């Protein structure tokens, strides 16, 4: 029997290697997907083999993550419950996709992951595997063994598996698009998040910084007139604006699995790019397009958060988003100060803004007759309804 395991290199999945090997008498093939996390992948590979893996794959998927997942999160202004840019949720279907590719390559129909029965990730991972490889059988050791962190450490020590036993106050999930922070010290939503929980947004620079972000068809292509690919743009923004203390998100999140959870994220680049993109959309869209886009944006974000990346509706909504983003070309100038961002200006060749029409000092004015006629017809629904109810 062979099992392909999505392997992060952390305690849970390291213990899972040996547990799967012993429980199922299986050969375990581990797959680590690089989606921009700041890990030492050579160390992760060594750890996998020490724990008992028979084969290990490290897959660099940063560009694919940016081009095929993050790009759509930007175009769809993806903020779950108006605040969370879906950093973890976006990465899960890609990781599952890469694990499935290895499983098919190795002719293995057992796939394992380290998600618990309490988290959203189990839903995202299981549904992605079911969509891409319906014949596969999914094993989630953490849903079966019910081991605490202490028991996992004991399990590893008893088998000679080297584990860093110093307790960390926080559980971190990191990728190109963001850093999520969990732990007992921040689980109480009535208490302030301790400063030591943050890494990307530790304030190193005081004052403010001004940046210009250039977009082509909804995709960011340059910072301060310097062209870069999307991976580089995200990396630069995370480092630069994060150093001013910008990019922190804290909210009480409605999880897929049925309860509320206090969630904390560091997402500097995501917030800069999504908010700049939203501003440029408002610049170029008609009012009807703008209202419609706001609606489908929220639907897209909900589907992705809920683990439904392979839901046909997500693809349909995305097609509409692509069509609307054809006009989202231009530049947005922003200012970052602390955890605040404001727009200084924006410009696009597709903006229907007309100074001649909008200016109060010169140009076009409707006549009194035109204004009266417009107001009469515009307010008719409201006035007639009010009259019959009085």
UniProtKB/Swiss-Prot annotation:
GO terms for cellular component: cytoplasm. It holds the Pfam family Arginosuc_syn_C. Its EC number is 6.3.4.5. ATP binds at residues 6-14, 114. Coiled coil: none annotated. GO terms for biological process: argininosuccinate metabolic process; L-arginine biosynthetic process; urea cycle. Pathway: Amino-acid biosynthesis; L-arginine biosynthesis; L-arginine from L-ornithine and carbamoyl phosphate: step 2/3. L-aspartate binds at residues 116, 120-121. PROSITE patterns: ARGININOSUCCIN_SYN_1, ARGININOSUCCIN_SYN_2. It catalyses: L-citrulline + L-aspartate + ATP = 2-(N(omega)-L-arginino)succinate + AMP + diphosphate + H(+). L-citrulline binds at residues 84, 120, 124, 171, 180, 253, 265. InterPro entries: Arginosuc_syn_C (IPR048268), Arginosuc_syn_N (IPR048267), Arginosuc_synth (IPR001518), Arginosuc_synth_CS (IPR018223), Arginosuc_synth_type_1_subfam (IPR023434), AS_cat/multimer_dom_body (IPR024074), Rossmann-like_a/b/a_fold (IPR014729). Keywords: Amino-acid biosynthesis, Arginine biosynthesis, ATP-binding, Cytoplasm, Ligase, Nucleotide-binding. The keyword ATP-binding applies. GO terms for molecular function: argininosuccinate synthase activity; ATP binding. NCBIfam families: argG, PRK00509.1. Homotetramer. This is Argininosuccinate synthase. It comes from Sulfurisphaera tokodaii (strain DSM 16993 / JCM 10545 / NBRC 100140 / 7) (Sulfolobus tokodaii).
